[in-house]
Amino acid sequence: MTSERKMLVTSALPYANGHLHLGHLVEHIQTDIWVRTHKMLGIQCISVCGDDAHGTPIMLKAEQLGITPEALTAEIKLSHEKDFKAFAIDYDYYHTTHSPENQVLATTIFERLQAGGDIVKKTIRQFYDPVKQMFLPDRYVKGTCPKCAAVDQYGDNCEVCGATYSPTDLINPVSVISGASPVEKESEHYFFDLPLYEELLKDWTRKGHLQAEVTNKLSEWFEAGLKQWDISRDAPYFGFPIPGVPDKYFYVWLDAPIGYMASFKKYCDERGVSFDEFWDKASKTELYHFVGKDIVYFHALFWPAMLAASGFRTPTAVYTHGFLTVEGQKMSKSRGTFIEARAYLAHLHPEYLRYYFAAKLNGRVDDLDLNFDDFVNRVNADLVGKVVNIASRCAGFINKRFDNRLSSELNDPKLHNDLLSARESVIDAFVSRDYARAIRQIMDCADKVNQYIDANKPWVLAKDESKLNEVHAICTMGINLFRILITYLKPVLPMMAKASEEFLNSEPLHWGSIDKPLLNHRINTFKPLMVRVEKEKIEAMLVQSKESLMTTPVKENTPVEDANLISIEDFAKVDLRIAKIVNAEPVEGADKLMRLILDLGDAQKQVFAGIKKAYDAEELIGRLTVMVANLEPRTMRFGVSEGMVLAAGDGQGIYLLQPDAGALPGMKVK
């Protein structure tokens, strides 16, 4: 089975300042299943990835560890590659953005943008650390909250009261890096003039390159108006210097997606493949990116505009997935559910997770929840109980009674053909990234096979020597049906498929190799392909995750002494009201702000809340929350905020307060 199609597939590049966790693996497993599906179809499908190895966090972490950024990123890259290999995630090339290939391509693209008039210079003001002599991102400034007087709060929001503000609003601000008091300073930055490409992007986003949910989201951003994109950072910075501009570097988000091209360029140089065939503006090949919903803006707006403006092809499609939650909540270090890949591997088989994620991924942008009771049930009941059990039950008789040789004919060709008839539908489900549908169809087939074996009862027939031929035929049938099932599951379970090929004594299985059954064929002695999940191992994994990630005590957020106690009269001054969120939209140009319109029954108020990273706008609309209704309005650069919504936080997540059923907009909270 061969095809003339040529495809290049990428996953988002993991950041090179920490180890992989299960949230990363959702995307990389999703990508790997899709690539394996196409390779089994005989399509030239090349997958590349690499580490995102630039930026301030990497520079500072390396300094903290007393090593160079190059040494840090090299070490993390090895860790990432080791984890990917353990989970059978098999990229054709895995590179790094800190590479000669990426520097050449980033410089080329920038110079083409500059020559085309797409780069503009603007002066901006931000906090500057006079000791470290560097500009400070918001998260590298801390001080006392201007709202509640809680100390040691970040420069963009307070984790005690939930207020959002600018770093310059902090009381007694200090640099997280040096402890010095920062000063405001101007700097000239380089911007990509994204609004010039608004019509091109509108056209591109409406031609089926994105999921419908993403296209709808982009429509909101178009309505709000596109902004020029800051693509430069000031020294000191770990990244590529902008040619001819002293002390200026490309922002990490400029060269990170170019890293896809750089990884492929390295692959081409080593394999003799044409880079231009895949990246030329007139390319007939296909280009696919798998990304999380948090980086859609970069991949569906900046990236295609930058490619088109610099003379390269644009993506065939950008496929977006949701976030991973654990037991219905965001991953949490304190609960032990922030699980690193290495902690999982210390206790559980990697293909349990591949199977579970496949059973939940549906091609939409929905979040995926890892529920451990469901995890145990799906693996034990479906994968082990239904699929592996078929081979186990039938192979025992073939191994012991028939010298490992299958019979010379099938006793139920119709059932064999019934399972084969599901092939196109299973392939279609995998290709459309609806892996959950594929798994359901495969398990339906497995049910039919188990019903066949249960109805024929070879273990009963085997007690009668005169019926051994029937036992032989039934078990031969079972082995051939298992062969079909494991072929269907091969993109999801490549390790188990390989072990099955060895057991079946067959060539590598692919979509077109299973039409002809194995008859009068010698198989090998069966060895267990997969064992059941033990709940104790899950508990041990959670304990390890909690212990390993909580070695540093969490600093308690406490307000200043005089603010510890208030009188009931003081509390009574705060007018807390039930509010209904009638509209929500992310604030363009602000990392964390969401603009909320709140209905108080007899009036509506606008509030800016720092919950953008915790919630999508769509999930907020219509829900009830609690707001401070008599807070003095505050003018921000995005508009006037007329109150504050209440949320809880542990430093790892933000959780909006929501009243019980029966509460109505405008009710006082007492």
Curated annotation (Swiss-Prot):
Keywords tagged on the record: Aminoacyl-tRNA synthetase, ATP-binding, Cytoplasm, Ligase, Metal-binding, Nucleotide-binding, Protein biosynthesis, RNA-binding, tRNA-binding, Zinc
Single GO MF annotation: tRNA binding
Catalysed reactions, semicolon-separated: tRNA(Met) + L-methionine + ATP = L-methionyl-tRNA(Met) + AMP + diphosphate
Short sequence motif named 'HIGH' region, residue ranges: 14-24
Binding of Zn(2+), residues: C145, C148, C158, C161
EC number: 6.1.1.10
Motif range ('KMSKS' region): 330-334
GO annotation, biological process: methionyl-tRNA aminoacylation
Record domain tRNA-binding: where: 570-670
Similarity remark: Belongs to the class-I aminoacyl-tRNA synthetase family. MetG type 1 subfamily.
Family annotation (NCBIfam families): metG (TIGR00398), metG_C_term (TIGR00399), PRK00133.1 (NF001100)
Name of this chain's protein: Methionine--tRNA ligase
Organism in which the protein naturally occurs: Legionella pneumophila (strain Paris)
Gene: metG
